[in-house]
Amino acid sequence: IWTKQKQETIEKIPPETEKIIAEAENSNVYNNSELDTIAHKEIKVENTQVEENNERLEIVENNNDIDPQETKEWLESLSAVVYSEGPERAHFLIKQLIDQAYKEGSNIPYTQNTPYINTIPADEEIKSPGDQNIERKIRALIRWNSAVMVVRANMRDPSLGGHIGTFASAATLYDIGMNHFWRAKSNKFGGDLIYFQGHSAPGIYARAFLEGRLDEKQLDRFRQEVYPGGLSSYPHPWLMPNFWQFPTVSMGLGPMLAIYQARYMKYLINRGLIKDEGRKVWAFLGDGEMDEPESLGAIGLAAREKLDNLIFVVNCNLQRLDGPVRGNGKIIQELEGSFRGAGWNVIKVIWGSYWDPLLANDKTGHLVKAMNETVDGEYQAMKARDGAYVREKFFGKFPETRELVSSLSDKDIWRLNRGGHDPHKVFAAYDRATKNIGSPTVVIAKTIKGYGMGKTGESVNTTHQTKKLDIDDLMYYRDR
């Protein structure tokens, strides 16, 4: 039961891991060309950048626009500046216009929010160099072992608890870091520091099992530290000093501790006590966790101290312990405003690669308008239903968006993925975060709570409390 095979047990981890990798290399589990399958029929990306920019700037109907033609001319002028002179020049001109407006007595409303789309455009992404067949296979095994560990523990004692849905939503976020960005301590390098989100601990144990660092007996003692070799419920170096680096529970401790750890490292570097090796401090957080006073309490200090060695990754699966995080609001936009206002570099990872052709063909702006206007409760409901529901409730908001997906089947629409589950989108965000200079960075990734759990747990309010899966749900989770 510890692997994706039916009721089989891995006895020798390293050889089995080698076998898994070999199988993945020869399989067609995941093909890079798969990302292009939705870009078919009427969906095509324009070849000419100037024409594309101009066509994208057609005005969405606005009853407050007394002169749409004038608005169109202004937008086309801005597009021409961006294309011919670059975004820096465009930013300068916009700032000059805003300053002049204030001088003229115009009180322009201020916002720290950008549209509800990815911060990094598709054509600027750095693609992951990894073998997606192997990485996806390994990710599936880790998700499976993480879930089964909790299920097996609660079959013995229902009071043990544990969390399946959190790591299921965050697996890709951790996987990309583990495979491509985090550097271990050695004799020549101090190592990066990672604050793991507390409720995702089962997934970290599951990966350690696949790597041969933990055995099956230890996984069978999850949340049973009283037994020799038992695993602690959450990251805790006092209980497991040879495994965990930092404690991150209760919720809210991780982000504040990470800020002061990054600050202390800068302190030591600035005084010549340690070398500047480009080490990073990563903190993985939940969107519900960000409501804890400690979570946002010191973000101003991080910006003032210019802690560019600090990276937050907020897993926005839209759900907390007892329900939605912001049912009638948008937690990603709220967090963006808080962090940008404090002076952080913000990278939003909202939409996966399957959305790219649709966004490229959103000539009227109605798709982005629908994205901006849809609240988190609606997004959560969509991922608990099916493609037909998404077509009607989301794309059906405007005739233009309905037409945009007219060539897609309900199955195609259901495959439109969220950014936090797309390895290429996550890789691009991490790559940019590690290269940022002069400020801390927060990566805000949109995911699905209980990803892969099917009707029992995917995007439903009870996901966080789900400790058991019946045989049908286990088979679905295994085969997905």
Predicted regions and their residues:
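Cofactor-binding active-site loop characterized by glycine-rich and histidine/acidic residues
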Residues: 130-142, 146-156, 163-305, 328-329
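Short internal beta-strands
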Residues: 194-197, 309-317
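Hydrophobic alpha-helical scaffolding
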Residues: 64-68, 83, 87, 128, ...
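N-terminal amphipathic, basic-rich helices that act as targeting or association modules
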Residues: 35, 40, 45-211, 475-478
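Long, well-ordered, tryptophan-enriched scaffold segments
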Residues: 316-480
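Short acidic (Asp/Glu) and glycine-rich catalytic loops that position anionic groups and cofactors
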Residues: 73, 151-154, 181-185, 238, ...
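Acidic, low-complexity intrinsically disordered tails
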Residues: 2-61
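Generic beta-sheet signal
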Residues: 192, 279-281, 310, 439-447
